[in-house]
């Protein structure tokens, strides 16, 4: 049986990553590819990279194809376009980028360390209303909230 981290590790052999620091410099220079945030809508609404689009991981595959309720034309038409996939910690984005590559996307990378790393680098973030979210607020919003019953028994 494979665990989640095993799946991520396998996908990392096939997926390129870009660090928040390297991509942040490029982003701030105005050279911005398609930013695809695959977190859940509530996560995205709380904070995201300005200019990113939200397509939750659970509907990603349908969003990349025509004729579905979830179809996102920008994605369907973007198979040759440079795409940076974003999640909270950089794991879901690796799995999503791997699937997108299998679906014919030729220039897709995962944001290493996810939006957490972006926040740690104190790069621009906003909420659903377009209000700036500073790094301290980002720390609070991105803090792990694993409950005792969710932890592995000892």
Give the location of each predicted region.
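Rhodanese-like catalytic fold shared by cysteine-dependent sulfurtransferases
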Residues: 1-33, 41-82, 91-154
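Active-site flanking residues adjacent to catalytic metal/cofactor-binding acidic residues
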Residues: 36
């Amino acid at each position: 049986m494979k665990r989640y981290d095993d799946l991520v590790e396998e996908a990392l052999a096939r997926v390129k990553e870009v660090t928040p620091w390297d991509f942040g410099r490029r982003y701030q220079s105005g050279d911005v590819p398609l930013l695809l945030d695959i977190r859940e809508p509530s996560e995205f609404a709380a904070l995201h990279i300005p200019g990113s689009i939200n397509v939750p991981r659970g509907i990603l595959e349908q969003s990349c194809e025509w004729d579905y309720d979830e179809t996102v034309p920008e994605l369907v038409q973007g198979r040759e376009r440079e795409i940076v996939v974003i999640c909270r910690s950089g794991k879901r984005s690796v799995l999503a980028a791997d699937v997108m590559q299998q679906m014919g996307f030729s220039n897709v990378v995962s944001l290493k360390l996810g939006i957490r790393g972006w926040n740690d680098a104190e790069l621009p973030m906003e909420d659903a209303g377009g209000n700036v979210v500073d790094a301290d607020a980002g720390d609070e919003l991105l803090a792990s909230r694993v409950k005792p019953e969710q932890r592995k028994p000892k």
